[in-house]
Amino acid sequence: MEIARETLITIGLTILVVLLIITGFSLVLRLIPGVYSSVSRSSFTAGRILRFMEIFSTIMFIPGIIILYAAYIRKIKMKNN
């Protein structure tokens, strides 16, 4: 049972890392002048996706980093015991 729990935690953290990488890229893309506006002008769907990713990344980035840091501290604590 413990192995299944650890596996699910690892899978969840991996998904969270991938989401944080995507949201971080979305935030960086917003900072590059011209790219965001040209993509949103060229395709309505791409503009909506970028807008959603911008909102999602703003909401998700800080809590995601805190969750990853807490998992890292927990892992270090378990190794020391």
From Swiss-Prot:
Q: Does the keyword Transmembrane apply?
A: yes
Under what conditions is it induced?
A: Expressed late in the viral replicative cycle.
Q: Which InterPro entries match?
A: Poxvirus_I5
Q: What UniProt keywords are attached to this protein's entry?
A: Late protein, Membrane, Transmembrane, Transmembrane helix, Virion
TM regions (residue ranges): 8-28, 53-73
Q: One GO term of the cellular component aspect?
A: membrane
Where it sits in the cell: the answer is:
Virion membrane
Its main localization is virion
Q: How does it sit in the membrane?
A: Multi-pass membrane protein
Q: Which family does it belong to?
A: Belongs to the Chordopoxvirinae I5 family.
Q: What is this protein called?
A: Protein I5 homolog
Organism, as annotated: Fowlpox virus (strain NVSL) (FPV)
